[in-house]
Regions:
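C-terminal motif of bacterial Sec signal peptides marking the signal peptidase cleavage site
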Residues: 12-14
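N-terminal cap/lid segment of alpha/beta-hydrolase-fold proteins
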Residues: 23-54
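Alpha/beta-hydrolase active-site loop
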Residues: 115-143
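Gly/Ala-rich beta-loop-alpha elbow adjacent to hydrolase catalytic centers
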Residues: 152-157, 161
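C-terminal catalytic histidine-bearing segment of alpha/beta-hydrolase fold enzymes
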Residues: 238-271
Length: 271
């Protein structure tokens, strides 16, 4: 038993050291884009954010990070979902919008008593997670005196952004990157277990039929194939303004951040 306890303590220490390293790297990325760190506390969880809040009464742009390192392997959840490469943060740092808020996902970079592996595995898109982000965004809207917001989500953060857009009336536009917007289609293609504790954005896609939205996908993305976003858009009834843009040569992580300002310029969202 002693060796087991020692091994557990060593694993926890290594996890803590890695989390600190990743947090320092994330802070450096954020500072390079003029974003300052802010730790938010809501619903028993600590959520790391970075923000640029110099303008008031403007459209608040909110970025939501991807799922991070949710699994160690197909059978074992990770003990720390912090992303090794925070693509969502890199996108936010490359975006000059002001005001802007970036939000990591629950238990990334920061731990708390409320952290449980279900929050980054089967319940990553649960009603509880959606409500948490609703609260964080509501508070940010008050801080900036904003009356509307735009949502940008990377990977699983794009699915969360879609769920938020379906539930809010102050969203001006939605942009996703490599997002698993149709969970049923995604688990079918990837041959994985359904996310039993999560809400599928595709089930209520009709709620955002008239919302301006652009879904970027990578031609060579094997994590979330382009057909997933296309399946989501097909769930939008009648006439809609949605677009699925397939970027040639891109995959799930490459090369979004490098050309993000140009991609934003091409779609012409109003901010």
């Amino acid at each position: 038993m002693r060796w087991l306890a020692a091994a557990l303590l060593l694993a926890l220490a290594c996890c803590s050291d890695a989390r600190t390293l990743y947090r320092n790297e994330a802070t450096a990325i954020a500072l390079s884009g003029g974003l300052t760190p802010q730790l938010f506390q809501a619903r028993g969880l600590n959520v790391l954010g970075f923000q640029r809040l110099g303008r008031e009464h403007a459209t608040l742009t909110v970025y939501i990070e991807g799922d991070g390192r949710a699994w160690l392997n197909p059978w074992q959840p990770s003990t720390d979902p912090t992303p090794t490469d925070p693509v969502g943060l890199r996108l936010a740092a490359a975006d000059p919008a002001n005001p802007l808020l970036y939000l990591a996902r629950p238990c990334q970079y920061e731990t708390s008593n409320g952290c449980d592996h279900h929050l980054w595995t089967n319940a990553r898109l649960s009603p509880e997670v959606v409500d948490l982000f609703q609260q964080l965004i509501d508070e940010a809207m008050l801080r900036t005196n904003s009356v509307q917001l735009g949502l940008v989500g990377y990977s699983g953060g794009g699915a969360l952004a879609a769920l938020l857009a379906e539930r809010r009336r102050d969203v001006a536009w939605l942009v996703t990157v490599a997002a698993n917007l149709d969970l049923a289609e995604w688990v079918r293609l990837e041959d994985i277990e359904p996310l039993s504790g999560s809400i599928d954005p595709a089930d209520d896609a009709a709620a955002i039929t008239r919302l301006p939205q652009v879904h970027f996908v990578g031609e060579h993305d094997r994590v979330v194939p382009p057909t997933v976003a296309k399946a989501f858009v097909q769930r939008l009834p009648g006439t809609n303004t949605s677009r699925v843009i397939v970027e040639p040569g891109f995959d799930h992580t490459c090369c979004w951040a490098a050309v993000w300002p140009q991609l934003l310029g091409q779609i012409g969202i109003s901010r």
